[in-house]
Amino acid sequence: MTLSTTIKTLAFASILALAPSQMMAAQKGGTFTTGDKTFLLNGKPFVVKAAELHYPRIPRAYWEHRIKMCKALGMNTICLYVFWNIHEQQEGKFDFTGNNDVAAFCRLAQKNGMYVIVRPGPYVCAEWEMGGLPWWLLKKKDIRLREQDPYFMQRVEIFEKEVGKQLAPLTIQNGGPIIMVQVENEYGSYGKDKPYVSAIRDIVRKSGFDKVSLFQCDWSSNFLNNGLDDLTWTMNFGTGANIDQQFKRLGEVRPNAPKMCSEFWSGWFDKWGARHENRPAKDMVEGMDEMLSKGISFSLYMTHGGTSFGHWAGANSPGFQPDVTSYDYDAPINEWGLATPKFYELQKMMAKYNDGKKLPAVPKAPMSIIKVPEFKFTEYKPLSYGIGKEKESNAPQSFEDMDMGWGTLVYETTVPAIENISTLTGEFHDFAQVYVNGKYVGKIDRVKNEKSLELPAMPQGAQLTIVVEGMGRINFGRAIKDYKGIIGNVTITTQKEDCELTLTPTRWNNSTIADDYQTAVKALAMPTNKMRGLQTKAGYYRGYFNIKKVGDTFINMEAFGKGQVYVNGHALGRFWQIGPQQTLYLPGCWLKKGKNEVIVLDVVGPKGEAGKLGSNVAPTAFCQDHPELDKLNLEKSNKHNEPGHRMDLNSETPVLKGEFKAGNGWQTIKLDKPVTGRYFAIQAESSQSGDRQIALAEVHLQDAQGNRIDRNNWVAFYADSEKGNSTLDKMFDLQESTYWQTEKGANFPHLGIVDMGKEVTISAFEYLPCAEQGAPGSVKAFKLYVKK
C-alpha cells in the first residue's frame, strides 16, 4: 500500500467515525426559500409534496418502512411534529433516545431521498395528550399556557434549545434534510396574540433555526389574526374543501406568495363512544390533484397515522371527548403500515406529477400478520395493590397536586349518618367509580357530562371511596389546562325534614396508582392481603402466550372493561368496552419467539363470569389478524333525540329569522336587540339546494359587547335528525371541517337545541356552512329561538 493510498484510507475511516449529525453538517449545504408564487429549492421552483408522520406513533423498527411507503406514494418530504411532553416527561429530564430519537428519524428520511418539515410546537395539538405540552406545567396553578407567562416561556425556551441541539445541524443549510420549521401551531384557533407568536418565533430562531425558512399555519378564517410579516403563511383544511376559497384571502394580501396547505386532512380521528371516522378517497385525491395542477404545495395529514401508544391519546372539547388509542385516521397507509385502497388511488394520481419518472415500488411489509389463540390471565391482584404515594388533606387532591401525570387516584373519607338518599356532586376528571363501605354504588363519567350520583342512606362513619381514572388531557382549544382527578370540593346533598342539607367532607386520604408497567409488575409481585376491601374485580391481570413466529397482530380486549395493556413491557394503549375500538395494535417487533407476557390494568374489571365477585374463572384474550375499530357497546344511543328534550316552539316568537346567503364562509346576523337565555334553538326551514338534508359546520353567538361567547360549557340538548357521527355537537366542536348533518330524507324543519350551561345575553348569531366545495347542505331559511 502506497503512502497516498494509506492517507486516503485513513481519511475515509475518519469520515465513517463521524457522528451522523456531523456527517450531515459536513455535506454540502443547500437553500430553500420563497420566490415569486413558488418555493425555491437551491434556486429552482419546488412543489412540496409532504407526508405527515409522527415518530412516537410508529415503533422505531418500522420507521424506515413507513418513510419508504410515503416515497412510493410520490411524496418528496416528511412532515413531523416534535412532541415536547414525550421528550421531557419530568421537568428538566430530556430523552431523545430510542423511539424518541427524532434526529435519527430525520436522517432516515434523508437516507431515502426525502426532505423534512419540522414542527416543534411548543404546542402541537395532534390528538395528543395536552397537545404536546407537559402535564407538569399544571403544577403551577396560575400558569397561562400558550401566552407570555414567564414560567411557561422559560420552559419553552429550554425545550426549544434542546430541540435545536438535535435538529439544527440537520437543516438544509448544514447539508441536512430540514427545509422548513414551523412557529407555534394553528394559534388563530386559540387566540389573538401577535406578541406571543413573535416571542415563539424568536425562541425558535435562537435555538439554531436562524437560517432555515420559518412558517406559521392557520385556518383561512383566522390566519391574519396572528400573521407575522417575516414568516411564510400556510393554510390548513380538509378533503372536499373549496381550495380557491381557502386561498382567496391569502392571495389578496400576499399575491406573490407561494401557496401551501400545511395540513390537508386525509381522514379524521376517532373518539370513545362514537363510530369510526372515514372520508372518501375521491375527495382527497381530487383535492390534491387540483392543488398540484395549480402548483400548490401540501402536507397530507395524516399519510400514516399510526398508534397513540400508552397514555398519549388526547381529548377534545367542548365537553370531554377522549380519543381512542388507534390513530389510523382513515389515512392512505393504515395503522399497521399497509397500503389501503386510498393509497393506490392517490398513487395513481401522484404519478402524473413525478417528472415522467416511475414511482418507487411499494415496499414489502416488515412483518407478516399473525394470530394467537385464546390464552388465560391466571394471575390477579386488586387495583389497590398498585397504590404508591398517599397523602392526607382537607380537600381532594388532583393528579398534579400528587405529582402524578397519568393513572388513577383513590379518594377516601368518612361521612356522618345520612338517613335518606343523597346526591354526590363534584368535578370528576375523568371516570369515577363510587363505593360506600366497599360496595359499588355507581359511576360518574365525564364523557357523558355527568357531575353527580345518587347515594344510598349511610350509617355514621360510613366510608366513601371514589376511584378516579384520568384519561388523556384535552389537546385543542382553551380547555387544554385540563387537571385530572377530583377538581375542587365534593358535596353531599340530602333532605332532612323541610331542609336541604349540603355536606362538604374536609378530611381525605388521597392515594396514587400510576399507570406504568413498573407499577403493574410491582403490584403483581405483592403478597396477598386485605388492602382496601372494595367489592370489585378491578385490578392487574397477567397471562402469557407462546408463538413460534413473530408478526404484527391485534389483541382483542372485549373480555375486559377499561384500562391499559402492556406486552413484554411495552404500553399498547387504552381500551374501553364502549368502543368503537375493541382491539389494540401489537407490533411484531415487540414480540419474541416463545413466551410473551401480557399485563392488563383494568380499572373496571372483566366482563362476564370472570368479573363476578368470588368467581375463580380467569379472563381470556386472543390476538386476531385484523383490527376491530368500529364496534360500539353503548348503554344508550349517543344521538340527541330524547323526546322530552324537544321544545314546543309553535307558540314561541323567534328572536331572529331570515335567510342565509349561498356559498362558503362565515356569515354574521345581528339581532334587533339583545336577548338573554340559557338555551338557543336553530330551526332550519329550507336548504340552498332544495334538498331536505342540511350540514351546519359551526355556530358562534356574540355577547352584548360583540365578543364571541365561550362555548366550553355548551351541551347538545336535542336534534331532530343526526347522520352518523355528524351529531349536533359538531356545530360547536371548534372544528370548521366537521358539521352537524341531518339524515337524507328527513323532513323540514330541522331543529337543533343547545344548552349553554348558564344564562347569557346574545346580540348576534354567526353561522358557518359546510366548508366543502359548493357548501353542500347549506341552510337557507332559518329561525333562531332563545329560551330561559
What are these regions (language model features)?
Residues 63-129, 201-206:
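Aromatic-lined substrate-binding rim segments of carbohydrate-active enzymes
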Residues 25-77, 107, 550:
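N-terminal carbohydrate-binding accessory modules
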Residues 152-227:
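Active-site neighborhood of glycoside hydrolase catalytic domains
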